[in-house]
């Protein structure tokens, strides 16, 4: 080999493998206002120290790899690397730790949830040195938030569009979720909307199947929408699911909904993907459409308490990517959701500012500046007896969505909707009069049922229905405040 082509190790470079903690565990580091902060629940493999595990997470989700590389010398790793700056043991758990990691903002593309997640929850989740890894929370800095459009419209603009104030909005998912023809589907929509609903909804499974193509469904739903509006004098909506196999097809469906004069469309944001969701959110703002978001696939990601990603992170990501509604559990229905934890991410969706809150599982103070809020949707196994609890838990700025709790009424769809509307109005009136919905809820519903045979029939059908199972997602104290 000639002297000109001989490869020599540069000064300061030594090949080999180094412990991650030598470069990526920095307990002396003070997080910057512009850093993205992450709280990971880390379960190391036996024999792996917590400092090495936390540093490995910081390294593998930022600039690090398994061995030293000579190109490290071509950049400033101190500027770009993630840093594990604090570790707390998880109370009540063996060999589990909350590891806090700070990421410099320059690691992430502006306005891209896709890029943010590709780094923070990418390959590191398959790292062999870890038995399990869960992202519990993120602190998104204001500087990064301002690169996103966020929700197309937000809570106040939606209320102004609908001219509905002072109460939760009411919705219903059309059932059976699959198998109806477009005409029969439209008939069910009409019966629900004329009975007192604000919205009806495509099920998340409904896209464009052989039994009901999307264009036919939209046409019959639009007919039902306008007929119900003419009869009731109220503005109505149907969540037309625009989710499709390609972004181009998704936008085509949203365009058709706008041409029909529909006020709202829908997207399955996790199965559809964040790039598609952000694209649709931008279209909706530009064209005056509200955007309803379903979270199908979330439990695959967030239900296991030791591995995956907590829904509060997915909720923050949705507020960045864009959506005016998102399903958020019910606390009292058939789906997983402990009360305080649920209210924690409901606050993250609606409020301009949230503080650290142990009881609600919020690890970081989060400011949303001018980003519009998102309406939480309570849906899944709820009926009229749940109405007082739902009104008390979620408050006015929410959507209470009954599927089987409407269409399962013994007298049909329209009476089912009447029952729910009467129950809601009774709860709102009682609350405004100063009554305690938590303790007097059943009394309030029984009193209202004396004046509504539809509500009385619903009360009889669902009087024994309960979903009482312990929540998997509970908060373990023993964390550092940031």
Swiss-Prot record:
The modification N6,N6,N6-trimethyllysine is found at residue 14. Belongs to the RuBisCO large chain family. Type I subfamily. The active site is at 175 (proton acceptor), 294 (proton acceptor). The modification N6-carboxylysine is found at residue 201. The gene is rbcL. Residues 1-2 form a propeptide. Its EC number is 4.1.1.39. Heterohexadecamer of 8 large chains and 8 small chains; disulfide-linked. The disulfide link is formed within the large subunit homodimers. The disulfide bond which can form in the large chain dimeric partners within the hexadecamer appears to be associated with oxidative stress and protein turnover. The basic functional RuBisCO is composed of a large chain homodimer in a 'head-to-tail' conformation. In form I RuBisCO this homodimer is arranged in a barrel-like tetramer with the small subunits forming a tetrameric 'cap' on each end of the 'barrel'. Substrate binds at residues 123, 173, 177, 295, 327, 379. Its cofactor is Mg(2+). Mg(2+) binds at residues 201, 203-204. One of its GO terms (biological process) is photorespiration. Binds 1 Mg(2+) ion per subunit. GO terms for cellular component: chloroplast. This is Ribulose bisphosphate carboxylase large chain. The keyword Secreted does not apply. PROSITE patterns: RUBISCO_LARGE.
């Amino acid at each position: 080999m000639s002297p000109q082509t001989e490869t020599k190790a540069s000064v300061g470079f030594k090949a080999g493998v180094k412990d991650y903690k030598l470069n990526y565990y920095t307990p002396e580091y003070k997080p910057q206002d512009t850093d993205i902060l992450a709280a990971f629940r880390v379960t190391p493999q036996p024999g792996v120290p917590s400092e090495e595990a936390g540093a490995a997470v910081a390294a593998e989700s930022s600039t690090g790899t398994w061995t030293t590389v000579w190109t490290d010398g071509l950049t400033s790793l101190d500027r770009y690397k993630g840093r594990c700056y604090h570790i707390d043991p998880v109370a009540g758990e063996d060999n589990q730790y909350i590891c806090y990691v700070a990421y410099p903002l320059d690691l992430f593309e502006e306005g891209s949830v896709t890029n943010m997640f590709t780094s923070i929850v990418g390959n590191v989740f398959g790292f062999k040195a870890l038995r399990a890894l869960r992202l519990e929370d993120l602190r998104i800095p204001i500087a990064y938030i301002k690169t996103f459009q966020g929700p197309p419209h937000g809570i106040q603009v939606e209320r102004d569009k609908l001219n509905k104030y002072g109460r939760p909005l009411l919705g219903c998912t059309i059932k059976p979720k699959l198998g109806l023809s477009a005409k029969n589907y439209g008939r069910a929509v009409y019966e629900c909307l004329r009975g007192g609903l604000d919205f009806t909804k495509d099920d998340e499974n409904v896209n464009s199947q052989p039994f009901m193509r999307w264009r036919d469904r939209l046409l019959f739903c639009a007919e039902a929408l306008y007929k119900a509006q003419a009869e009731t004098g109220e503005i109505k909506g149907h969540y037309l699911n625009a989710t499709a196999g390609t972004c181009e097809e998704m936008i085509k469906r949203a365009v058709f909904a706008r041409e029909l004069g529909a006020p709202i469309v829908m997207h399955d944001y996790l199965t559809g993907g964040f790039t598609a969701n952000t694209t649709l959110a931008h279209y909706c703002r530009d064209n005056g459409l509200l955007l309803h978001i379903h979270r199908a696939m979330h439990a695959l990601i967030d239900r296991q308490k030791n591995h995956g990603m907590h829904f509060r992170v997915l909720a923050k990501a949705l507020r960045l990517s864009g959506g005016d509604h998102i399903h958020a559990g019910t606390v009292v229905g058939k789906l997983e959701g402990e009360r305080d934890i649920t209210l924690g991410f409901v606050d993250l969706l609606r409020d301009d500012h949230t503080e650290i809150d142990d009881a609600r599982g919020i690890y970081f103070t989060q400011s949303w500046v001018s980003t519009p809020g998102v309406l939480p949707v309570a849906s899944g196994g709820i009926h009229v007896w749940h109405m007082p609890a739902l009104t008390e838990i979620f408050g006015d700025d929410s959507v209470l969505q009954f599927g089987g709790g409407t269409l399962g009424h013994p007298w049909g769809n329209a009476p089912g909707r009447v029952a729910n509307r009467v129950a809601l109005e009774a709860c709102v009136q009682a609350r405004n009069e100063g009554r305690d919905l938590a303790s007097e809820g059943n009394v309030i519903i029984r009193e209202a049922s004396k004046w509504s045979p539809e509500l009385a029939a619903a009360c009889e059908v669902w009087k024994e229905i309960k979903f009482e199972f312990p929540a998997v997602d509970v908060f373990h104290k023993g964390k550092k405040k940031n």
